[in-house]
């Protein structure tokens, strides 16, 4: 139990006992009652700080518990997301909130099927210090805010029930293909929800024409990739986008593939 709650409960019980003793005339004067009440408050505060020194809270353990809870809750979400509805927020437990529907590719995996990008979702949100958010996850009991500052990657974990503001510096981001290392913060998938159009931008320049889909992109999983059978594969270019339409992340279903033009 929280030490502060114990201290408050102790004072309330002590004060209640003093009131009972006064009503039973064991404490005759109000002056004596006032002095004893003040003494009880002082002793309670002293005991509270003594307890903090004698039994310090294990913040590392609490931090680990939060991380474990978050990792467990995120196992089933992979790169699943829902776009934010502007009439009301639509945020599934552990899912990613994308402000203005802008996401960022930050990690490249080289597979037998070509380059597959695990999307690290990005919003346009800037905090008071001007750092740019990379990932924001909002769950029932905790929030994760991953962001970049001066080339280093950090994340803050906030929990409603435990620690608020655990601030952790991550190891530097490693790219699987160094050819893409200069594109950090510069590759964006742009999505116009009103028209269900999606396109790719690098360094703010639109490098592909709009791609029209015959279904709503909500509840979709998006991959960027390249074809290992084409020359562009060796040069590390993205040449296609894959959209998995499924409401359940455990079953991605059949991908819809569109090439960049």
UniProtKB/Swiss-Prot annotation:
Keyword Cell membrane belongs to the record: yes
Record key words, sorted: Cell membrane, Membrane, Transmembrane, Transmembrane helix
Keyword Methyltransferase: no
Membrane topology: Multi-pass membrane protein
Coiled coil: none
Residues spanning the membrane: 4-21, 33-55
Entry's Gene Ontology cellular component terms: plasma membrane
Localization: Cell membrane
Highest rank taxon of the organism: Archaea
Protein name: Uncharacterized protein AF_2291
Species for this entry: Archaeoglobus fulgidus (strain ATCC 49558 / DSM 4304 / JCM 9628 / NBRC 100126 / VC-16)
Top-level taxonomy: Archaea, Methanobacteriati, Methanobacteriota, Archaeoglobi, Archaeoglobales
């Amino acid at each position: 139990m929280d030490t502060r709650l114990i201290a408050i409960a102790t004072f309330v019980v002590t004060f209640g006992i003093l009131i009972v003793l006064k009503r039973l005339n064991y404490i005759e004067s109000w002056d004596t009652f006032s002095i004893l009440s003040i003494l009880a408050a002082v002793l309670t505060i002293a005991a509270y700080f003594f307890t903090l020194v004698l039994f310090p809270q294990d913040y590392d353990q609490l931090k680990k518990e939060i991380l474990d809870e978050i990792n467990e809750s995120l196992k089933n979400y992979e790169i699943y997301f829902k776009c934010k509805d502007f009439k009301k927020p639509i945020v599934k437990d552990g899912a990613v909130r994308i402000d203005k529907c802008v996401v960022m590719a930050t990690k490249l995996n080289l597979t037998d099927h070509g380059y597959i990008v695990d999307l690290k979702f990005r919003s346009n949100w800037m905090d008071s210090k001007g750092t740019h958010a990379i990932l924001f996850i909002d769950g029932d009991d905790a929030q994760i805010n991953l962001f970049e500052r001066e080339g280093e990657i950090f994340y803050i974990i906030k929990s409603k029930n435990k620690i608020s503001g655990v601030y952790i510096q991550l190891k530097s981001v490693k790219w699987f293909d160094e050819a893409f290392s200069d594109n950090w913060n510069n590759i964006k998938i742009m999505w116009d929800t009103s028209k269900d159009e999606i396109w790719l931008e690098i360094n703010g320049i639109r490098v592909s024409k709009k791609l029209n889909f015959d279904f709503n992109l909500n509840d979709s999983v998006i991959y960027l990739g390249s074809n290992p059978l084409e020359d562009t594969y060796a040069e590390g270019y993205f040449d296609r986008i894959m959209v998995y339409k499924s409401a359940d992340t455990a079953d991605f279903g059949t991908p819809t593939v569109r090439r960049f033009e």
